[in-house]
């Protein structure tokens, strides 16, 4: 299978990098500090959601802003302690792309996303974070904004995601979707193509755009 595109849009956590251990470590500490019970915390989905949404599910509205700032500090500080690592295939795939043909689209704040990306040497020309949008994934706004930043028709963009909410955002934006089974089982992911991770793919830049193929 070969997919043709003009731009590639990547989620970050679970797609380009792994930060799951850091997320669990920092949020568990945060929950203890804010008196969130283990039962309440266990019932909340963390992956693929903004901190504002998560905290809003757990604390009164008047405590959200301060609590979000606290968990952001915890997560940013954890980056220096090895809280992020590249996932297989990330470096080779990004190195094969022109800088103006790809973007990172994440539910993290700009400060946290920049820290994680910088830690592994990824410096996208276009970066869309929770701070740049009013509605996060699964709403299409983040991916539509990335397409505008790159000057590419959404219909010619391909979204790479590991989370159902992100894949839903890509579909709603009218984009082709590629799911990576890094944090969810393949059968849980609704996408045009499902692969294990980015190492399963190869890209070739042509005069007409970018060709994405499954290796082997």
PLM region spans:
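A generic secondary-structure micro-motif detector
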Residues: 17, 41, 83, 103, ...
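N-terminal helical cap/lid subdomain that shapes the substrate entry/recognition surface
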Residues: 2-98, 109-111
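Asp-based, Mg2+/Mn2+-dependent phosphohydrolase catalytic module
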Residues: 1-5, 91, 95, 99, ...
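Short, flexible loop segments at the rims of nucleotide/cofactor-binding pockets, characterized by
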Residues: 79-84, 105, 135, 172-173
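Hydrophobic residues in well-ordered beta-strands that form the structural core
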Residues: 18, 104-106, 179
């Amino acid at each position: 299978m070969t997919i043709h595109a003009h731009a590639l849009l990547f989620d970050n956590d679970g797609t380009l990098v792994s930060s799951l251990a850091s997320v669990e470590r920092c949020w568990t500490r945060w929950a203890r500090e804010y008196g969130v019970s283990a039962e309440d915390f266990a019932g909340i989905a963390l992956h693929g959601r903004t901190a504002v949404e998560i905290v809003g599910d757990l604390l009164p509205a008047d405590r959200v802003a301060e609590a979000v700032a606290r968990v952001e500090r915890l997560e940013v500080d954890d980056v220096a302690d090895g809280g992020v690592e590249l996932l297989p295939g990330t470096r080779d795939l990004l190195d094969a792309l022109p800088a103006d043909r790809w973007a990172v689209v994440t539910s993290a704040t700009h400060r946290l996303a920049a820290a994680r990306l910088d830690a592994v040497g990824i410096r996208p020309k276009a970066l869309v974070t929770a701070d740049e949008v009013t509605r996060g994934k699964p709403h299409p706004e983040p991916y539509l904004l990335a397409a505008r930043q790159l000057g590419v028709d959404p219909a010619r963009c391909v979204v790479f995601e590991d989370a159902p909410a992100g894949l839903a955002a890509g579909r709603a934006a009218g984009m082709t979707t590629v799911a990576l089974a890094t944090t969810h089982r393949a059968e849980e992911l609704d996408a045009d193509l499902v692969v294990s991770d980015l190492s399963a793919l190869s890209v070739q830049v042509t005069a007409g755009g970018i060709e994405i193929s499954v290796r082997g």
